[in-house]
Design a protein with these regions (language model features):
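Short terminal alpha-helical segments
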Residues: 8-57
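Amphipathic alpha-helical binding modules
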Residues: 83-130
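Charged, low-complexity interaction regions
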Residues: 28-34, 49-57, 75-81, 97-107
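Short, hydrophobic/amphipathic alpha-helical patches that form generic packing surfaces
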Residues: 58-76
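Loop-to-transmembrane helix junctions at the membrane interface
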Residues: 62, 81-84
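Short, aromatic- and cysteine-enriched interfacial helices/patches
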Residues: 3-11, 129
Length: 130
């Protein structure tokens, strides 16, 4: 992502568009996620992959379900993705909370910091800052 794209001078980056597409694919309307969150997600993905996203689509597809679950909540996520996907993402979130320093944990904390986490998710998983 180049510097000018971050500030909208050249429009939104291809990576942000790919993340938007991945979020749409799991039922999360991109407008529900602030651009600052999207840019941070992309930076977290890059950091996890050594500074470069080798496969942008695969990386975004890995992040999108966690973002969608945190923002939409269990019911809406399940409506869009089915019960098996819901159980899988809930297991990922439980694991992330137990581990504490995983990429999934960072995605969940990011939605919490941005105040876009669905309240029932906060309550169910006892998410809190600090």
């Amino acid at each position: 992502m180049d510097f000018l794209s971050v500030f909208g001078i050249r429009g939104r980056s291809k990576e942000v568009h790919r993340l938007d597409d991945a979020m749409r694919a799991v039922g999360l309307p991109p407008k529900l996620v602030p651009d600052s969150v999207k840019l941070t997600v992309l930076n977290l993905l890059k950091d996890a992959e050594g500074g470069v996203l080798a496969d942008v689509d695969a990386s975004c597809a890995r992040a999108a379900p966690m973002l969608a679950y945190c923002v939409l909540g269990s019911e809406e996520f399940s409506e869009a993705n089915g019960p098996d996907a819901t159980l899988a993402i809930e297991a990922r979130l439980h694991h992330a909370i137990e581990i504490g320093e995983s990429l999934d944990a960072r995605f969940a904390m990011l939605t919490l910091l941005a105040k876009v986490t669905q309240p029932k998710v906060i309550e169910r998983f006892d998410l809190r800052l600090g």
